[in-house]
């Protein structure tokens, strides 16, 4: 710390470079406290800036805590006392919030006496400006210096008005208007084409005239002199449109061949042919005829002249938007994030320097956290502040530049920050306090290869320095079933299927939760959901992994999108604006082209051309009147606008267009359209949004107040809060947290799954959505709005550089373990650059099943009783579930462990319950013979016998129930119908019903609420068979083959005791002649051998789906499972009452273990006794 303070005293600007995990926030806190303690600066003179609201709040809390602790430890220190008393005056803020604070709190200096109200972006204002421009384009284009033909070309690039608006909005949000303007100035060749277009049109038509003088055979011969002889349908005609001519020269095979190809050997052109060829080449050069390959590497012609005009008009519209927004800012004092920063810069640069001097007098030193993310305009602001004598401390990690969409760039950082700070004013932090030694070693090697071996311009280069581990983390690790795993693990599949890799990732998380433990600071505990974070490249990955995890019954923190951010809200909001008389139907064009009205583009054009928009306006006027008189609700008003069939039929008839008339007759409302398309989530959002808006309207009582309230709701959302909600994320300890890699920045996480399945060609600069290439060349950042092939390689390097940083940020969040999901994507490319296979201590094909061994039996658990109710389920309608679509537990065990049987049996048609094969000892005489018949007789009798009859003496019980027993013996096996067997069964059943079971402290005959032979069906996950091959190396013994269908089961008895629900199953297995043969050890061995532990989990799953809504209910209301081995109850039951109950096995499965896929997978593990 002394070294840092010394550098601060001796330099005007300091740079602290801190790699991930090296404690830059800790350093920043200590710098602040030491600046105060050493009297270098008072607390009022220090300004701390960062990027997000969340980081600001965390930093504020931590710094105040440090000040408080320092004061507590030295209360005699007057400086610390003063700092503690004034600690709330320490200004810690985001850069944008500080800029807004400066504009709003130095009003005399800025001469702006109204406070600005911030909002994230001018989305709706831009919509209105663009729609207004399109409506008034005829009168505006002259003022904007847009020619008629240029506007026509611009509009031709979109099918709908909505597309034009969206395109302009995206262009504004990219914030590259200045760059586009600068680029357009360099395109003088295209401007010259437009200036002499009439002359070029004449040249083209003259060529056509010359061709018309040739016969068809002569033209074909002319063509064949350039290629191998072939047939071609040659078509051309005169044109008066320079853009069509440019298109023709590109796409017409005849013309493009004559321009591009040389004549074949031994072929000689006639003077006439030579003239036409030369004229075409000259014309092609004059209109910049070029052929390019598109981003997807298919041959595709590009008409750059047309694209130039589109971009030219786009630029002029963007400048018009800027002008109109300035009016909006002036009239409403509402300002977006871009204008906040640009306004601050303009005031600081003003000649009077009033604002600059005011800030200088207030703050003497500024600490800027995450300085690598500064945009050029933000860097310029700090350079201006530096000129006023304010000291700057930049804290940065250039490897974490991941906000290119905020205009951060490594060249800005290197050129404008790092290279302008003296070497002796720089500090590099090296000790990683976050990650374990098992992670730091291989990560150093990975990023050394990625960064230090990269080919890049010096100004674009990022230097990687190895991190050093903190010894206190050396023994931190993840253990699965007693086996330690590597710090870095690669998850891959044998296929390149996205679905497979997501499913395998979800299953890995599932079993990590079931079998994994964390060892930290010599303590070991189970892995919890909050330990695991899944970091995704974007929203698409979040949606896919969320879907895969929920298939495995694992909850995530992904929530539904807030209604203010939905498309449904936007469209309803525009309709509401149409109901405001003051708006003068400004938003009508938008709603006409929106999906909520679904008006065909041809009809919109006819309405505009024939000036019939007034019909819709008149209709809405009538609705406004009804609304004002309270004769119609707001929802009904909106519904009338979106679906008034008579209105649309009337309008359609005016057009006399049969297709439009048919559309009007068959028009369905928005709800019907969503139902037809199966978009039920959108329907739910639409109805919820209507309900919320309706409630606000009911409170406000008029449309103007409603609009004002809704706009306030939008405006008052903090930019960072909106950004955090984009991925629909919230925190919950009972769920797996999913977030983007961008949102994970600055956080430490125990276990990280890193997901980026985006192919590199689909990334930012190569997508069709992005309108330009950005790259570094000749000492400066360049933009190419044509996206030319020759610039693609430079743009690729630029995007790859950012992807390296995103990968770095994601990988360095982990404390204990990192799981990298590898598929044919950017991640694969980066791992290749990292030379991953040359690095030790990395598990290259991580498979969770290598670590899953035999699972221990759960220990007996007792829970506090809570009130619950046993509700018998409705009977299963058996004909709904065909036999070929059901399986049983017995069929699963047969499939899993009897290969020969499996290979010769069609399990689609299985419908039997397997009985345990028992060794028979001929020398022993038993009253009740072994085999399945006795079991079936007992089960059938127990179903009919009324349990309460056992409260009486045995003789009376036998008298009341012997006929039932005799009937069942006769029915199942008449050879067993003897007096001895009847009496033995009666005695056994009586003993079972009158025995006080310790687990429930009651007798079965005393139970009042019970359900016998309860049937259940569990839906089989059809994806299981696919999941199996994801781990195929570990399934050699698993022969289960399940079709999409159901697993059926029948539970012998479900009952309520002590306010809990219990399951009881009768087992007639023969374990020996003596009662001691049914001790707990033998019972556990039998349970294990026969896989009964998996059977009772299936029973638990069956009733869980029927009786319990969630984990909380399961834990509170489920008492457990009792397996009652009936042969232990043949004689006197008094002998059972030993320290351990003979013949009774009890267990309470954990909620997470009651999972069908997990049970089936455990069946595949061969057990050894």
Curated annotation (Swiss-Prot):
Q: Which GO cellular component term is one of those annotated?
A: cytosol
Q: Entry cofactor note text? A: Binds 1 Mg(2+) ion per subunit.
Task: Report the cofactors.
Answer: Mg(2+)
**Which Pfam families does the UniProt record give?**
AAA_19, PDDEXK_1, UvrD-helicase, UvrD_C
Q: Which residues form the UvrD-like helicase C-terminal domain?
A: 459-746
Which residues are involved in binding ATP? 18-25
| Protein EC | 3.1.11.5, 5.6.2.4
Q: Output the InterPro entries linked to this UniProt entry.
A: DNA_helicase_UvrD-like_C, DNA_helicase_UvrD/REP, P-loop_NTPase, PDDEXK-like_dom_sf, PDDEXK_AddAB-type, RecB, Restrct_endonuc-II-like, UvrD-like_ATP-bd
Region DNA-binding and helicase activity, interacts with RecC: start-end pairs: 1-839
Q: Which sequence ranges form a coiled-coil region, renumbered to this chain? A: none
Residues bound to Mg(2+): 939, 1052, 1065
Instruction: Report which superkingdom the organism of origin falls in.
Output: Bacteria
Gene Ontology process terms (BP): double-strand break repair via homologous recombination
According to its record, what is known about the domains?
The N-terminal DNA-binding domain is a ssDNA-dependent ATPase and has ATP-dependent 3'-5' helicase function. This domain interacts with RecC.
Could you say which protein family the record assigns here?
A: Belongs to the helicase family. UvrD subfamily.
Stated role = A helicase/nuclease that prepares dsDNA breaks (DSB) for recombinational DNA repair. Binds to DSBs and unwinds DNA via a highly rapid and processive ATP-dependent bidirectional helicase activity. Unwinds dsDNA until it encounters a Chi (crossover hotspot instigator) sequence from the 3' direction. Cuts ssDNA a few nucleotides 3' to the Chi site. The properties and activities of the enzyme are changed at Chi. The Chi-altered holoenzyme produces a long 3'-ssDNA overhang and facilitates RecA-binding to the ssDNA for homologous DNA recombination and repair.
Name of the protein this chain belongs to: RecBCD enzyme subunit RecB
Q: Which organism is it from?
A: Borreliella burgdorferi (strain ATCC 35210 / DSM 4680 / CIP 102532 / B31)
Species lineage, top-down?
A: Bacteria, Pseudomonadati, Spirochaetota, Spirochaetia, Spirochaetales
Protein encoded by which gene: recB
